Structure formats: structure tokens, C-alpha cells
Design a protein with these regions (language model features):
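A short helix-loop-beta-strand connector motif used in the catalytic cores of GNAT acetyltransferases and
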Residues: 46-58, 80
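Conserved acetyl-CoA-binding loop-helix of GNAT-fold acetyltransferases
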Residues: 86, 92-105, 129
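Conserved beta-strand in the GNAT
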Residues: 58, 65-73, 80-85
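Conserved active-site alpha-helix within GNAT-family acetyltransferase domains
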Residues: 97-98, 119-136
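A short, internal acetyl-CoA/4′-phosphopantetheine-binding micro-motif in the GNAT/acyltransferase core
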Residues: 84-91, 116-118
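Conserved GNAT-fold acetyl-CoA-binding loop/helix
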Residues: 19-47
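Conserved GNAT acetyl-CoA-binding A-motif
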Residues: 106-118
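A short beta-loop-alpha structural element at the N-terminal edge
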Residues: 4-19
């Protein structure tokens, strides 16, 4: 991808976002033997409901295929970041990093937080490198820990 343009997703993108979600998270869940992961059983109806409450960003390839996306929602000063996803064949190109940083810059907040599976090391370590710190965890299955991470802005003197 020569140029990476981040755009707001539209309601018409929801079916493609569900497809991206299955392709991005499916292999990871299978690798962890977590085939009943909630993210894999989400319905189109649920995604439409969720879409209406969030700001969703997307990156498309030259053919108009959505290859990356993230969503965010600010509630009482806290930005929840969710569904950072990139098609496997487009990973390691900076798409996820750009989307992740862009959602934080577009939505004013006092604190940002997210949750991720601690056993999926690449995204977990990426979030740590981006300044997020663990504040809570919960066992969700055999050998599976859901980690809650947060980041607060640096304050000056």
C-alpha cells in the first residue's frame, strides 16, 4: 500500500468490518484453542448496534477493500479503544499503529483504556510500547487471561 489514508467508516461498511473481524481474529483464536471467543460469534445486528455508539476508522487498499480498522468511544472522559484489527496479509506495515494513534488523537479524552488477551503477545507488547499499563486482569478460560490496560496523559510541572 503506497499511501495509507485513514477515513471514518460508514454504516455501509459494517458487513465488511464483520468480515475483517473474522479474518483478523479468527486465526489468533484458533491458535489459542479459543474457538468460542465472543468476538467470533458476534452478529451483524450486534455490530450495527455497536457501530452506532462508536467512532470507527478504516483503511482501505487500492481496490476499496477494508484492510484495517479500529473503533473508540469516549464516556465520562475515558476513551475505550476496541477492535484494532488488520488483515493478516497486511500486518507489519504500520497500519495498526497508525489507526491506534489516530483514534486517540481524534477523540479527546483524559484516559484511554482497552482490553486484550495477554497470551497474544504481539498486540499486548505493542500496547505496552505505546505507553499503556496493565491495571486489571481476568481469567477467561484455560490458559487465557484478559488484560485491561490504560494510559493517562503525561502531566507537566
Amino acid at each position: 500500500m503506497e499511501t495509507m489514508k485513514i477515513e471514518l467508516a460508514t454504516i455501509q461498511d459494517v458487513p465488511a468490518l464483520l468480515d475483517l473481524q473474522c479474518k483478523a481474529f479468527g486465526p489468533l483464536c484458533k491458535e489459542l484453542d479459543w474457538e468460542d471467543a465472543p468476538i467470533l460469534s458476534e452478529t451483524l445486528e450486534h455490530l450495527y448496534e455497536d457501530f452506532a455508539q462508536c467512532t470507527t476508522l478504516k483503511v482501505e487498499n487500492e481496490d476499496g477493500l477494508i484492510v484495517g480498522s479500529v473503533h473508540g468511544k469516549v464516556d465520562d472522559g475515558s476513551l475505550y479503544i476496541g477492535r484494532l484489527m488488520v488483515l493478516p496479509e497486511y500486518q507489519q506495515r504500520g497500519i495498526g499503529k497508525r489507526l491506534f494513534r489516530e483514534i486517540q488523537s481524534r477523540l479527546p479524552h483524559l484516559r484511554a483504556w482497552l482490553c486484550t488477551c495477554q497470551q497474544v503477545r504481539p498486540p499486548y507488547e505493542f500496547y505496552l510500547r505505546e505507553g499503556f499499563k496493565p491495571y486489571q486482569s481476568e481469567v477467561v478460560g484455560p490458559g487465557l487471561t484478559w488484560a485491561y490496560l490504560e494510559k493517562t496523559p503525561m502531566t507537566g510541572c
